[in-house]
Amino acid sequence: MDSTYGSLFTSNTESGNKQRKAVINRKTNETDISMTLNLDGSGKANITTGIGFFDHMLDSFTRHGLFDMDCNVKGDLYVDTHHSIEDTGIVLGKAIKEAVGDKKSIKRYGSMMLPMDETLVLCALDLSGRPYLVF
């Protein structure tokens, strides 16, 4: 979400502070995920999950949020997509938490409703620290 829509993340780069970044790796029996997230980016996305629509959604999240994200997911897609999506959500949450650090430069929660193509997108985000992902 950029400033046009009321960003959750106030940019640190305007005041000369370092960019807020995180690198998270998670390996389980079902998945192997690596993610680099820069909250003060420009919308660059390099996402490979093996799930086309999920890649598209993460790419849209990154581009419209003006974040930079590299995300590589290897999962047990021969079973189904559940583990890959769930574990990517866990990694994304950890990356956001690490990148915002002390939370001094953010608003705790925000929401956005956006008509995009034939879809109405509703996103609500709360950075209180309680884990939850709906896809």
Regions found by a protein language model. Name each.
Residues 2-135:
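Structural preference for solvent-exposed beta-strand-turn elements
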